[in-house]
Amino acid sequence: MDQPEDTDALVRFENITYSYPYSDSRVLSDVNLKLEKGEFVLLAGPSGCGKSTLVRCFNRLVPEISGGKLSGRVIIRGKDLREEKVHKLALEVGMVFQNPETQLFSLKVEDDLAFGPENLGLPGKEILSRVEKSLKAIKLEKLKDHFIFTLSGGEKQRTAIGGNLAMEPEILVLDEPTSDLDPSGTREVLDLLRRLNAEKRITLILIEHKLDEVFELADRMLVMDEGKVILDGKPFDILCREEGKLKKLGIHPPQIIEISRLLGFNCRTSSPPYENILKRLAELLMPSTRELQPESRKEAKPKIPPALCPEESLSHVRIEKLSCRREDGSETLKNVNLDIKYGEFLALLGHNGAGKTTLAGHLMRFHKPSSGRILLNGKNISKYSTAQLSQQIGYLFQNPDSQIFMNSVFEEVRFGLKNLKIPEEEMKKRVNSALEMMELSVYRNRHPQALSRGQRQRLAVASILALEPDLLVLDEPTTGQDRGHIHKFLDKIRELNRLGKTVILISHDMELVAEYAERVIVMKQGEVLLDGPAAEVFLSPEELDAAGLIPPLPARLALDLRKQGFDVPGMLTVSELKSFLRAHNVEIRD
């Protein structure tokens, strides 16, 4: 996509082409781009399309750190970055990664913010001034003396952003900064980015797959595929005009745009406010479904049953009075009781630090409970060896790099089978099947670190599936993946579930949970707050709010329509809303 040279542009990419040292294929191919000061740019595209590689060219992490072959020029404020040192570029470009833990170095918040300015050798007064301004910008003044390990995920990410702000860069690049955060933490970070762009005119480049939360913040959207920028324009314009092309790339429009178009709104320049969508729905449904007066529904509230445990159904996992304490005496789990049946597909929800991962980790004996027990197939898990547990339970960690260590994709998937002494022919069959299921067959000979994070996530899952466990525990398995791959992946997991596999999904993505999980468990501060069918749990706004969660848009609309007196079911997805409207002869636009 050629653009005329603009000497006034803040950033120019000129014919950027790049290949990693361990691959002959181009990750970036003849990219031409210019950015103006104060722009808020949303960078989208399928996993592995080159987004992360592109933004690492801003501060020469590519190729100085990654190696490989880079041709073309990146120019910032007229300076050719080939002539600049990486450490000096920190003054021009701030970089925030997916996992804040990778760039937090100090014990306390204010110390971490001071780290960069101290390394510049600035006077003490200047360092203090920058730290104070950064604390104010990220709204963590009251936590400046707190230890970083005590912060929530959102607070840690804001601290990472604050550390960059203390360097006073003109450009801030963020590579999926909300991917590991709960909805509350995501709101914190996105609100901060909005303020930084509006008040300080910092140029923002944001890589993000979760378009629902970010598309209205950006004033420009770039879409990449196969190392090239293929779309460049206003977010609303691209999302509305290029829906077919985007869906082929695995990029799905935000729910508010989908629903607005269904109801006949023009979304070319903006989406209508939630209140207008609700009003239009009420007008369309008035003739057929308004069977109750608002007052009669005013106090209606879905009841959330305790853990589902029909006695005639054998438990796959039974958790009894499970508690866990840290060394400092604080409780991470408090008297948890759950009964999980064979073949269930359930989701564990809750804010960062609610105890979801800790609870799931107890299944693999990663933690030692202070009291209580867990039965797997009716047998106490303390009686299983680690090898036996690994054959019974497939566990996917939040960070795929925690369980990837071989030199090729094929060898990675083969590793567990080899340790189990599976016959060679059977081993090859399982490896090939798992790679095909995760759409990684073409990468079988590639080094895992040459894959994108989303692809590495799928590789970790393939390694698990090859072992053929009966229980799958997936801790944020969709991190770093585009919507298309997410749906393909979870469709495969649902197929396995229908074949009898039990699935426990830990996620912060309410839309995906609403679409795939049959049962939802919400945790807060180490306790089970809600447990029941997904439709009922998502119609409990007060409890969800207390847990820092936001129900999907269709569920919120259903709840508010009920409050107005409409007899509507609990709708969780856009397709369920479509079906409901069609059933009541409401004319909609597909």
Swiss-Prot record:
**Gene3D superfamilies the record matches:** P-loop containing nucleotide triphosphate hydrolases (3.40.50.300)
Q: Which top EC class is named for this enzyme in its record?
A: translocase
GO terms for cellular component: ATP-binding cassette (ABC) transporter complex
Where does this polypeptide localize?
Answer: Cell membrane
Q: Which SMART domains match?
A: AAA (SM00382)
Q: Which InterPro entries match?
A: AAA+_ATPase, ABC_transporter-like_ATP-bd, ABC_transpr_CbiO/EcfA_su, ECF_ABC_transporter_ATP-bd, P-loop_NTPase
Q: Which CDD domains match?
A: ABC_cobalt_CbiO_domain1
Stated membrane topology is: Peripheral membrane protein
Q: What is its main location?
A: membrane
Ranges for the ABC transporter domain?
Answer: 11-251, 317-550
Answer whether the UniProt record assigns the keyword Cell wall biogenesis/degradation to this protein: no
Q: Which keywords belong to this entry? A: ATP-binding, Cell membrane, Membrane, Nucleotide-binding, Repeat, Translocase, Transport
Annotated ATP 2 binding sites: G350, H351, N352, G353, A354, G355, K356, T357
UniProt cross-references to Pfam families, sorted A to Z: ABC_tran (PF00005)
Recorded E.C. number(s)? 7.-.-.-
Q: Where does ATP 1 bind?
A: G45, P46, S47, G48, C49, G50, K51, S52
Give an example GO molecular function.
ATPase-coupled transmembrane transporter activity
The free-text function statement in the UniProt record for this protein reads:
Probably part of an ABC transporter complex. Responsible for energy coupling to the transport system.
Of which family is this protein a member? Answer: Belongs to the ABC transporter superfamily.
What name is this protein filed under? Putative ABC transporter ATP-binding protein MM_3016
Please report the organism this UniProt entry assigns to the protein. Methanosarcina mazei (strain ATCC BAA-159 / DSM 3647 / Goe1 / Go1 / JCM 11833 / OCM 88)
